Amino acid sequence: MARCSNSMALLFSFGLLWLCSGVLGTDTEERLVEHLLDPSRYNKLIRPATNGSELVTVQLMVSLAQLISVHEREQIMTTNVWLTQEWEDYRLTWKPEDFDNMKKVRLPSKHIWLPDVVLYNNADGMYEVSFYSNAVVSYDGSIFWLPPAIYKSACKIEVKHFPFDQQNCTMKFRSWTYDRTEIDLVLKSDVASLDDFTPSGEWDIIALPGRRNENPDDSTYVDITYDFIIRRKPLFYTINLIIPCVLITSLAILVFYLPSDCGEKMTLCISVLLALTVFLLLISKIVPPTSLDVPLVGKYLMFTMVLVTFSIVTSVCVLNVHHRSPTTHTMAPWVKVVFLEKLPTLLFLQQPRHRCARQRLRLRRRQREREGAGTLFFREGPAADPCTCFVNPASMQGLAGAFQAEPAAAGLGRSMGPCSCGLREAVDGVRFIADHMRSEDDDQSVREDWKYVAMVIDRLFLWIFVFVCVFGTIGMFLQPLFQNYTATTFLHSDHSAPSSK
């Protein structure tokens, strides 16, 4: 029983001792805060300097937590950053032995003096941080303040290589009311911290260098600038924009492979042109309305639109050639040589067999006509008789001798006069039909030649269009691969324009 009472007394003593120590610790921190923020010795409106000429050195460092978005059209970058600020305040010092060896204390940031460091190139009017967190104060007067903030900063968007582009968006920090003679801003680190960074699905972080800028013409000017060098991830725009454009352009190639007789050449050309116009309107809603550069996708769309317009013009010319006839156009000899003999071989076109056979027959007939074979049916002249044009002359001579020998037969010969006129008319009709068929055959051959010329022109422009599209597409989209984007390049371009107040 005595042991139990002793144990209870021991536990009670330990509990009372722990409670007293906690109360004493709380009392110590409370006494320290009251000591530091005593209105009689501390005024948060006064700069922590012993005299007017003393500089207050403020160390800055940006920690990027998240790259929220980059709005290309409005040219605004939204980021979630932690702005580290460190300085010394001689009024917030104490001796640790007077306060139970307490070396650090956290004070509300709105109750102490703060350097009014703001984002100078903000785009929404929110210059200050969004949350005033507590400041960590050490016994030697050094203050560590890490407020989080969501900044919207102005960013000049370079659209030349969109969507394979890299951007340099800057964040410029400086004191709003204090100049260099009162506050000296220095970099705590040459690069921004990425220890707590959440990766973005649209951008890759290339480099985050920081620099301290001074103006030679103004000795009171100083700022801290961080360069956010970021590269776009092009997969989204490649799948949703570039590949559809390439496929639509490939449809324009089929215009030259489409037969002219189907009547859908112009319809296909106009449809492709309208589709490209829709994509061009989509691009205009994404990129900023600038006249300094044309985005890469916009250049490609304009390139394809020019090609499609060219295909429309060539299709009109091909259709015009396709529907020509001997009554409207005469085929020049050089057209026959170039488009019927030379180009088909170069373009790997094989002439149809029936066309070759018809051409051989036509050449053979013309050769016979030149040799006098046109007298196959009958000869014109005073001794020619239509009734005897298809009769063997030897038999005619024998028949004539028989008629002369017998007087009765002479009367029969005279009675055949009306028959002679009918036969002449029949022969004239046969000759007219033969001439008409020959003319129709010649006209049909000429029309077939014009159609073949149109097909050769179609095939010629097909190969030209294929080569121009392939090499033009490769040449345009290989440009971003040869661009040499480095942090030094961006920084050199920024240093070329000196900062000023």
UniProtKB/Swiss-Prot annotation:
Cytoplasmic side: 260-267, 322-459
Name of protein: Neuronal acetylcholine receptor subunit beta-2
Topology class, membrane: Multi-pass membrane protein
Catalyses which reaction(s): K(+)(in) = K(+)(out); Na(+)(in) = Na(+)(out); Ca(2+)(in) = Ca(2+)(out)
Site (Key residue for a rapid dissociation (K(off)) from the conotoxin BuIA): residue numbering on this chain: V136, F144
Record topology, Extracellular segments: 26-238, 289-300
Stated role: Component of neuronal acetylcholine receptors (nAChRs) that function as pentameric, ligand-gated cation channels with high calcium permeability among other activities. nAChRs are excitatory neurotrasnmitter receptors formed by a collection of nAChR subunits known to mediate synaptic transmission in the nervous system and the neuromuscular junction. Each nAchR subunit confers differential attributes to channel properties, including activation, deactivation and desensitization kinetics, pH sensitivity, cation permeability, and binding to allosteric modulators.
Lineage: Eukaryota, Metazoa, Chordata, Craniata, Vertebrata
PANTHER family for the chain: NEUROTRANSMITTER GATED ION CHANNEL
Family the UniProt entry places it in: Belongs to the ligand-gated ion channel (TC 1.A.9) family. Acetylcholine receptor (TC 1.A.9.1) subfamily. Beta-2/CHRNB2 sub-subfamily.
Any one of the GO CC terms: presynaptic membrane
